[in-house]
Design a protein with these regions (language model features):
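N-terminal strand-loop element at the rim of the active site
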Residues: 14, 32-107
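A short, basic/aromatic alpha-helical/loop segment that forms part
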Residues: 14-15, 214, 243-247
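Nucleotide-sugar donor phosphate/pyrophosphate-binding loop at the beta->alpha transition
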Residues: 113-123, 143, 160-179
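A short helix/loop element that forms part of the nucleotide-sugar donor recognition site in Leloir-type
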Residues: 122, 174, 217-231, 235
Length: 247
């Protein structure tokens, strides 16, 4: 009997963690031992068509637009408004959000998006299935949703950031990572920083490097186009987002 695994991610738009998840799912899909499901918390993202055929998307509704496009932003705001109305979340979580905002002001790290993830997670669709493993592939909403709203025999969470710089706190998390059976930072520095915040999670925190399709990168490197000057030496290109939370 195949093991049932649910992955949860905030959106499926074009970004590093999402690309790494797609590659991991492709590898797992080649094995016949897993029944793979995916829940996209915000229910949107343009990379849905790149999922391997064996992955079942459990969202009742899904919009194939990027959160960076104008229509995608409008859909994102609608999702947030809906989450605020479900279960009286806006009122029920008001004290939590005020306290979290107060801490952000005190530490001079005001990041409104971090305040909304709890409300979005609490207002998202619920899954009736019980899984062998549930995986929160991102911090924030995905982690809160898996910790509090998914039935699973085992739960795991990935950490893609420097947790001390990303704007999250134990108060904001409600200590959600103590509810997981495994935590996987994607690098050694990420592991070190996470354990500064959650030292009691050390026994089940292990580095899990992102899965990268090296053949695809080499193939694209040889594709037509590129620099038009006459330089024939070695070029080194780094692509990334330079923000404090990147570990």
């Amino acid at each position: 009997m195949r093991k049932k695994i649910l992955f949860v991610i905030n959106t499926l738009s074009r970004a590093g963690a999402e690309m790494a998840l797609l590659e991991l799912l492709r590898k797992l899909d080649k094995e016949d031992t897993y029944e793979l499901s995916l829940f996209v918390l915000m229910g949107q993202g343009e990379m849905i068509d790149q999922l391997p055929p064996g992955v079942h998307v459990v969202n009742e509704r899904y919009i194939r637009t990027s959160v960076l496009e104008e229509n995608g932003k409008k859909q994102m705001y609608r999702t947030i408004r809906h989450a605020a109305a479900v279960h009286g979340n806006a009122l029920r979580l008001s004290v939590y959000m005020i306290r979290a905002l107060g801490y952000m002001i005190k530490t001079k790290r005001i990041q409104p998006d971090k305040l909304l993830w709890r409300m979005i997670a609490d207002g998202a669709e619920r899954q009736n299935e019980t899984y062998d493993l549930a995986v929160a592939y991102l911090e924030g909403g995905s982690a809160y949703y898996v910790a509090d709203h998914v039935n699973a025999k085992k739960k795991a969470a990935f950490i893609h950031i420097d947790y001390t710089q990303a704007g999250y706190t134990r108060q904001l998390d409600r200590d959600c990572y103590t509810k997981f059976d495994a935590v996987f930072p994607i690098g050694e520095n990420g592991e070190k920083k996470f354990l500064e915040v959650y030292p009691e999670c050390k026994s089940y925190t292990h580095v899990f490097h992102n899965v990268i399709n090296q053949d695809m990168i080499r193939r694209k490197a040889k594709s037509y186009g590129g620099f038009s000057d006459n330089y024939d030496g070695i070029r080194i290109l780094t692509v990334g987002r330079l923000t404090p939370q990147k570990s």
